[in-house]
From Swiss-Prot:
Function description: One of the primary rRNA binding proteins, it binds directly to 16S rRNA where it helps nucleate assembly of the body and platform of the 30S subunit. Binds mRNA in the 70S ribosome, positioning it for translation.
Originating gene: rpsD
Family membership: Belongs to the universal ribosomal protein uS4 family.
Subunit-level organization: Part of the 30S ribosomal subunit. Contacts protein S5. The interaction surface between S4 and S5 is involved in control of translational fidelity.
Name of the molecule in the record: Small ribosomal subunit protein uS4
Gene3D superfamilies cross-referenced by the UniProt entry: Ribosomal Protein S4 Delta 41, Chain A, domain 1 (1.10.1050.10), RNA-binding S4 domain (3.10.290.10)
Amino acid sequence: MGRYIGPVCRLCRREGVKLYLKGERCYSPKCAMERRPYPPGQHGQKRARRPSDYAVRLREKQKLRRIYGISERQFRNLFEEASKKKGVTGSVFLGLLESRLDNVVYRLGFAVSRRQARQLVRHGHITVNGRRVDLPSYRVRPGDEIAVAEKSRNLELIRQNLEAMKGRKVGPWLSLDVEGMKGKFLRLPDREDLALPVNEQLVIEFYSR
């Protein structure tokens, strides 16, 4: 299953919860979940039957995958890697997802969504420890410095995004220097650091069935 390239607002409606895939629009009255809080399609407003246990786990898996915007293959590979590591599988899995460069760029406020962050990375606007990295799935390590590339510092999009970050706080596992257009990945986030509308235990059960 490849990466979804259609209207992202449909994904929120399909999962029945805001996934915050479109930046500021998700916080405005224009958000599709505010205007049409039911699944897309001609039968979306009909009362749904009680879902099976499998369907509940599938929806939770899809919800988490769509939040991070990655393909099923990438998602499954990260899960399998997490399941082989020491620690609580769910927390380790979320840590791997949060360590992706596109996600860190989004968390630092260089981009308003993970989709936009992927574009910035792919187009060479981001450096890690002073070296340009154009792979969104690049694994960021604790202590790494993530910055806007020198040639990209006058891009209006990035400047506007960082201007909006003034007065805001990034997650406690990150540090941000707005004026310097750079930040640091201090550590892997703890589960309580992440305000994700997901029960990762159901995702584990889905893949462990």
